[in-house]
A protein has these predicted regions:
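ATP/NTP phosphate-donor binding region
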Residues: 1-77
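Conserved beta-alpha junction segments in alpha/beta enzyme cores
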Residues: 26-34, 186-233
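Hydrophobic structural segments
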Residues: 72-74, 121-123, 129-131, 209, ...
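N-terminal glycine-rich "phosphate-gripper" loop used for MgATP/nucleotide binding
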Residues: 82-91, 96, 112
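Short, acidic/small-residue loops that bind anionic groups at enzyme active sites
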Residues: 97-125, 129-136
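Conserved anion/nucleotide-ligand pocket segment
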Residues: 131-207
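Internal helical hairpin/lid segments
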Residues: 214-261
Length: 261
């Protein structure tokens, strides 16, 4: 596996939009708090040329998105790459990625949701460790959920070893709206099979993950710790149930299975 160098103070983080753009979520002004937070944490924030603007599906063209990815990996000053948000179409970029360029310039890259396709493809084709974590706009959360997220994000990208403990609370609301009233619930994990394991993790958003099935970008699930999350907006537990069945048919002997939302 290729493990990118840990982030240090004053390192540059490049923001890109492989799926939806900043214009889908209010533009630069509405997300200024995210940039301010990264700056306060000691990092330099720069943006790809195509993080704004969009077509009917909320993205920019394939060639523009590919250009931002390749430019970020090529730039020696960039030490980490973070996606704006998720979306629906990062998988259409995969045939056009220069995986040799990425492998020769390993960097930290982080995002969530639709980023699953990009993250797993990069790892499958290059061996580069990728990070399933906060997207750029989630950094504007200033409440206790934001504090937990920020701490985990910084630990993952700056430390070689750290202990990740579950958040004490969770919410399912419109966190991205500044005037949204948030309701937090106590975290209640349910353990079906207890034990201790170590190994490599693979996974992400389960809906997006299976866009890779049968392609050269499908991850190797065998003997892995599988992490899966499922968005609860507009879909049911029945949808998740059949996707989970497919996971278990692809991975005959996973080391562990962790489920989230």
């Amino acid at each position: 596996m290729l493990i990118p160098a840990r982030l240090k103070q004053n390192d540059e983080i490049r923001i890109i939009a492989p799926s939806r753009t900043l214009d889908c979520v209010g533009g630069f002004a509405a997300n200024q708090t995210a940039q301010e937070k990264l700056t306060q944490l000691g990092f330099k924030v720069t943006f790809g040329n195509y993080v704004s603007g969009m077509t009917l599906d909320g993205t920019n063209s394939i060639s523009e998105r590919i250009d931002d990815i390749h430019t970020a990996f090529s730039d020696p000053n960039v030490k980490a790459i973070q996606t704006v948000i998720g979306g629906f179409t990062s998988n259409e970029l995969l045939p056009y990625l220069d995986f040799d360029l990425i492998a020769n310039n390993p960097k930290n890259i982080c995002g969530f949701s639709d980023f699953t396709a990009l993250a797993n493809a990069i790892t499958a084709k290059t061996g580069l460790v990728t990070y399933y974590g906060p997207a750029y706009i989630t950094l504007k959360m200033l409440d206790k959920a934001g504090a937990y997220q920020d701490n985990a994000f910084i630990q993952a990208l700056t430390q070689k070893h750290y202990e990740l403990r579950p958040s004490q609370t969770w919410s399912s609301d419109e966190w991205f709206l500044s005037d949204s009233k948030r309701t937090f619930y106590p975290t209640a994990w349910k353990v079906y099979t207890s034990g201790r394991v170590h190994g490599q993790t693979v996974g992400g958003n389960v809906n997006t993950l299976f866009l890779l099935a049968g392609t050269p970008y499908q991850p190797d699930f065998e003997d892995k710790i599988i992490l899966l999350e499922f968005a609860d907006d507009g879909e049911t537990w029945l949808d998740f149930s059949r996707l989970l069945a497919q996971v278990l048919q692809l991975a005959k002997r996973p080391r562990a299975l962790l489920l989230g939302r």
